[in-house]
Amino acid sequence: MSCSRSDAEHYISAGWVRVDGRVELVAESRVGDSQKVELDAHATLKPAAPVTILLRQPTAHAGDAAADASDGDPAMEYLKSAARASDDRSGIRVLKSHFTHLKSVAPLEKGASGLVVFTQDGRIARKLTQDAGGIEREVIVEVEGEIAEHGLKRLNHGLEWNGKALPPIKASWQNERRLRFALKGERPGQIVHMCASVGLKVLGMKRIRIGRVPMAGLAPGQWRYLPNGGKF
């Protein structure tokens, strides 16, 4: 078949073209006379649907390129070298265009690890930014020290921050060194402040869920797509 240069570039960037059986994503690649070029039978000129990527961000350490990211978001640096989870069941084909125009919409506190979100979808971006106060986030917090009397009850309901009462949350012991927090409208520094208010020092934080979306199945440094129609 014949097509314009712009159409050909679209087919290639969308992953519809194979050279010797392998998907070719670089339009400028040279193809030899003996090589077999195939266009997928389902190829379309429709723009690729926007995607959302879920990354398990490792804990940043001094000296990491991500820890020193100039844009202040280490997750973006981790994503550049991260690997797609082998059990990603979204059915979405990886395209080069999926890694452009991504917006980080659920960054972690400095030094924390766990689930972060990148999206090209404006609806999801608004959900996780403008409407973030209504979405519950679950965080595992490693602590040391002896909790104050009635400390767990106070964590759940009874603390103040900057002179204002904090809304009720769900806090429980996972084991003798780890607390599980489930809270909405989390603000930077809030968990550290809450723990300090009841005599505990935070050693580490790991976010394991945002709304309905869990981190389960992702190893540190791995990512997967949010399935089409997936919701937070």
Predicted regions and their residues:
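Basic, flexible Lys/Arg- and Gly-enriched helix-loop patches that mediate nucleic-acid binding at interfaces
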Residues: 1-232
